[in-house]
């Protein structure tokens, strides 16, 4: 980890006293379908990382112009450096979202940036100047650890109460058993742990709540002391990575059921319920097993699961293992619950499935946009006939695509899919050392929402290899008005 050196003094402004939901006119949209009719995105906020790259600079929030009519389209128009070096910005969320749509006093103003390595949680003011966000305040990791024992914050979701819930993946020493959920008030003051004593998950990562079913489900990555050093398959055998879903009472915070996904669900990372708040089903992406798993509620109020999509590993030459998993590291669901999109970070493809029948997804689109098996790579896949093959990956604006597709974001209308290619600096260095030297990038894919299908937009390419302080790693993306992975309806 880089030395923590303060470079900017934090500033403080009023939050406006945002509280719970009671009337209409708050942030977001009344329903997921209403959100689909929202305005087209003009800006995207992207976490950009120097931690772990060898460049001794703070991570930053990049603002990217995604308005095709703008002269600065497809470029970074603003960079907000964090106050310290060594954070590892990763995921992001909002102080309020569509779960607070009923409260006119609530404002979607602050982008929440948990720092996975340093443990800080930043609040970024995006309202005063959306094209040039500013730092509002940050939550100190020592205060978090002293009051709750938590460290390694990851996913942030806004609650209908105006509070913010953040999953934390371990304790200060990097042990998974110290993980749990941090509850912040509307002005980012630490309240306590959200879960009841004795009800912490085995491992932490992502979570999603569905209030009408009085349920929150969380997933499992692994022990920070393991994953922060890169991926070691032996650590899976040693029990340092997870394979469980934790079913919590909502908002009670008690574990009601522990679902063991077994070998079909190693490293279950991102989780999403269907957006329709009345639905009692959703999906989780198992990274190492490379399965999409559907979970669903039974008539007796318990929950079950089934594998509905399986990405088979490919036999390969010139790699660290004889077989290569796809490594599903991110997925999302369109706001109308018709399509699911997921990435295979190692294989290099993005897939689109129709999930109108959630039990039986149908492949409707697939496109290769990087990966270890693209033409020109030393790694080759081996077919059943013994012949080797690689995938054709196009250039965009004369640039070759580096790394593999990682975080994705979908436009509200479902017609534009954005993708970055950095997972986590230690893993990037291990699997895709090229992006440590040349930086990562954002691409945009046009989506056919009628028949299905994915096509690269040849006019959009944001190259983080050209950044003023050197190549950086772009990770999660957010629109100022919310999106299909930030907003939850109640």
Swiss-Prot record:
The keyword Manganese does not apply. Induction: Induced by cadmium (at protein level). Induced by selenium (selenate), copper and hydrogen peroxide H(2)O(2) (at protein level). The induction in response to sulfur starvation is repressed by glutathione (GSH) (at protein level). It comes from the Eukaryota. GO terms for cellular component: cytosol; plasmodesma. One of its GO terms (biological process) is cellular response to selenium ion. Selenite binds at residues 21-22. Pfam families: SBP56. One of its GO terms (molecular function) is selenium binding. Expressed in seedlings, roots, leaves, stems and flowers. InterPro entries: Se-bd. Keywords: Acetylation, Selenium. The modification N-acetylalanine is found at residue 2. Interacts with GRXS14 and GRXS16. Interacts with DALL3. Belongs to the selenium-binding protein family. PANTHER family: METHANETHIOL OXIDASE, SELENIUM-BINDING PROTEIN 1. Binds cadmium and mediates lower sensitivity to stress requiring glutathione (GSH) for tolerance (e.g. cadmium, selenate, and hydrogen peroxide excess). Probably helps to detoxify cadmium potentially through direct binding. Binds selenium, cadmium, zinc and nickel in vitro. This is Selenium-binding protein 1. It comes from Arabidopsis thaliana. The gene is SBP1.
């Amino acid at each position: 980890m880089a030395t923590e050196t303060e470079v900017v003094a934090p500033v403080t402004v009023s939050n406006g006293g945002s509280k719970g939901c009671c009337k209409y006119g708050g942030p977001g949209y009344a329903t997921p379908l209403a959100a689909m009719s929202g305005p087209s995105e003009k800006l995207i906020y992207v976490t950009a990382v120097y931690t772990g790259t060898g460049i001794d600079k703070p991570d930053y929030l990049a603002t990217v112009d995604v308005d095709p009519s703008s002269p600065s389209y497809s470029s970074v128009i603003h960079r907000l450096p964090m106050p310290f070096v060594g954070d590892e910005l990763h995921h992001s969320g909002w102080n309020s979202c569509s779960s607070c749509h009923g409260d006119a006093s609530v404002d979607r103003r602050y982008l929440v940036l948990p720092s996975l390595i340093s443990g800080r949680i930043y609040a970024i003011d995006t309202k005063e100047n959306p094209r040039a966000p500013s730092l509002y305040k940050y939550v100190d990791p020592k205060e978090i650890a002293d009051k709750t024992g938590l460290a390694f914050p990851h996913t942030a979701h806004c609650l209908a109460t105006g509070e913010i819930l953040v999953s934390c993946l371990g304790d200060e020493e990097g042990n998974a058993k110290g993980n749990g959920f941090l509850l912040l008030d509307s002005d980012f003051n630490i309240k306590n742990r959200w879960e009841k004593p004795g009800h912490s998950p085995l491992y932490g990562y992502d979570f999603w709540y569905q209030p009408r079913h009085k349920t929150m489900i969380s997933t499992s990555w692994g022990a920070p002391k393991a994953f922060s050093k890169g991926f070691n398959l032996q650590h899976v055998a040693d029990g340092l990575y997870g394979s469980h879903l934790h079913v919590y009472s909502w908002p009670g915070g008690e574990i009601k059921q522990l679902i063991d996904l077994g070998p079909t669900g190693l490293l279950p990372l991102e989780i999403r319920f269907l957006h329709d708040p009345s639905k009692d089903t959703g999906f989780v992406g198992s990274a190492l097993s490379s399965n999409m798993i559907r979970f669903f509620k039974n008539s007796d109020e318990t929950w079950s699961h089934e594998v509905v999509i399986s990405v088979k590993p490919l036999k390969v030459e010139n790699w660290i293992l004889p077989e290569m998993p796809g490594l599903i590291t991110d997925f999302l669901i369109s706001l109308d619950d018709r399509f699911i999109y997921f990435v295979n970070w190692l294989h290099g493809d993005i897939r689109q499935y129709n999930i109108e029948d959630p039990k039986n997804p149908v492949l409707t689109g697939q496109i290769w946009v990087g990966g270890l098996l693209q033409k020109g790579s030393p790694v080759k896949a081996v077919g059943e006939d013994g012949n080797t093959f690689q995938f054709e990956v196009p250039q965009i604006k004369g640039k070759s695509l580096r790394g593999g597709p990682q975080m994705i974001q979908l436009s509200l209308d479902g017609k534009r899919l954005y993708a970055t290619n950095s997972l986590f600096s230690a893993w990037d260095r291990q699997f895709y050392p090229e992006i440590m030297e040349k930086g990562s990038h954002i691409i945009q894919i046009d989506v056919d929402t009628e028949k299905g299908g994915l096509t690269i937009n040849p006019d959009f390419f944001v190259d983080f290899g050209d950044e003023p302080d050197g190549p950086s790693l772009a990770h999660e993306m957010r629109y100022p008005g919310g999106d299909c992975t930030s907003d939850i309806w109640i």
